């Protein structure tokens, strides 16, 4: 099994403005619209393969509600050759840290059936 790199919610801000990183919210579009981390794009967990649109040179930073779905998605994307980091504790830990939040929308279109 490939090791999955994790980062803390407080370390997430270090990646927000990096041109080599993409922050991905794996929650549902409804959850994303209520609140999400600034600069994050929404690719629901069920559509994680839509991440193939990103260059393998990018670091994909994944978060979900509590951190478990992002670990599963990180494992899949790592197998596909991506550099991936999963946020421990998900958005719940990020909220608890009183860090940046946004209600701006930036959703990636996926081929949903």
Placement of each model-derived feature along the sequence:
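Short, surface-exposed ligand- or partner-binding patches at beta-edge/loop junctions that are enriched
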Residues: 63-64
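Rhodanese-like catalytic fold shared by cysteine-dependent sulfurtransferases
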Residues: 1-22, 29-59, 68-113
